[in-house]
Amino acid sequence: MLSPTNSISKTAPVPPQDSSKPVLISEEPQNQLLQKVARTALAVLLVVVTLGLILLFYSFSDLQSFPWCCQTRPSTKEQPTISIPVPLPSPPLAVPRPSTPPPPVISRPSTPPAPTPAISPPSTPSAPKPSTPPPLPPKAPKPVKTQEDLLPFVPEQVFVEMYEDMARRRIIEALVPAWDSDIIFKCLCYFHTLYQGLIPLETFPPATIFNFKQKIISILEDKKAVLRGEPIKGSLPICCSEENYRRHLQGTTLLPVFMWYHPTPKTLSDTMQTMKQLAIKGSVGASHWLLVIVDIQARRLVYFDSLYNYVMSPEDMKKDLQSFAQQLDQVYPAYDSQKFSVKIAAKEVIQKGSGSSCGAWCCQFLHWYLRDPFTDALNDLPVDSVERHENLASFVQACEAAVQDLPELFWPEAKALF
């Protein structure tokens, strides 16, 4: 006999003669089969829905750009041309090819196919058609650069002249050293021993372009006071007694006024400050010595600048001195009513190739003027700058040897006229 549990899961033995009857299947395997079929159908449904959503949210051009997109063969049926954009920066134009028909439109099976318009970047302007390119403007001819334009040829003579100038400057600087105010004052004291009419005015502190006129007027006022027997109103020199100074003023006929000039300061106080700074450093810098000769006997103002126009142009300086000469006519009139005249001595740059010989040149010109005030010695200067400074070096050596016996920074004793 069979148990009740086995009756559900197992079948009764089939007689051999009845083999044509169907074999019965239990209910539990049948349920499992139905579950598998349902799961498969659900998976297929999800795949179909997913593909449908993809088709809804992606255009044809996006689908065709995927790597799994199938490549279809072109059909013979005429289809509208679809322009597929290419990423920037150079999108090509969609031009139908006569030999190859365009690809068909891929659409969903549930909805009828619809033509897709051409897609192009909104910010990209349409390019011109290849068949009608715009005319190009004519190009300007490029200048032809030769080797001379890139590397200009420098003649060998230029290098030779540069070397000669450098050698000449070194020779000149070795011949004529820079003269300071002490050497210039000693030179004036030496000139006084040769020409009694010259007054050796102190050069410490020297006159400047801002106060030389006041200094000349003050000396002439003191000279008038001495001639009248009156006391001196101006300040006395530092290294000269009052009696000796009065004797110098009484017999003087020529005032050599040395001016110290620097192009940077614009006032008298700034000039004195610059002078002090250069003296501490022991450097001449851009300073320059100028000379104004006041010839009382000849009633003449003579201006000498070895650099010719270092302060201002000779024309402007002459106009300024002519105005000052009219003022001197009122301050120190002549007995015969003769007026002061003005002369600009230098007609060119005298100290060529040297930047520190201005003081020596001023003393050299003063010495020439004392020997003969009516002869222009500058006309006889050598043309060659080295030869010119060799002559100046001879004068400098003679002066330096002569002033060695003079007292240190003291005025020489003037002789009384009566």
From Swiss-Prot:
Compositionally biased spans, kind Polar residues: 1-10
Annotated compartments: Secreted; Host cell; Membrane
Topological relation to the membrane, as annotated: Single-pass membrane protein
Major location category of this protein: secreted
Transmembrane segments: 40-60
Entry keywords, A to Z: Hydrolase, Membrane, Protease, Secreted, Thiol protease, Transmembrane, Transmembrane helix, Ubl conjugation pathway, Virulence
Enzyme Commission designation: 3.4.22.-
Residues covered by region (Disordered): 1-23, 72-144
GO CC annotations, alphabetized: extracellular region; host cell; membrane
GO biological process, one term: protein deneddylation
Keyword Endoplasmic reticulum assigned: no
Active site: H288, D305, C358
Pfam family membership, one: Peptidase_C48
InterPro entries: Papain-like_cys_pep_sf (IPR038765), Peptidase_C48_C (IPR003653)
Pro residues bias: start-end ranges: 86-141
Molecular function as annotated in GO: cysteine-type deubiquitinase activity; deNEDDylase activity
Biological role: Effector proteins function to alter host cell physiology and promote bacterial survival in host tissues. This protease possesses deubiquitinating and deneddylating activities.
Protein family: Belongs to the peptidase C48 family.
Protein name: Deubiquitinase and deneddylase Dub1
Organism: Chlamydia trachomatis serovar B (strain TZ1A828/OT)
Upper classification of the organism: Bacteria, Pseudomonadati, Chlamydiota, Chlamydiia, Chlamydiales
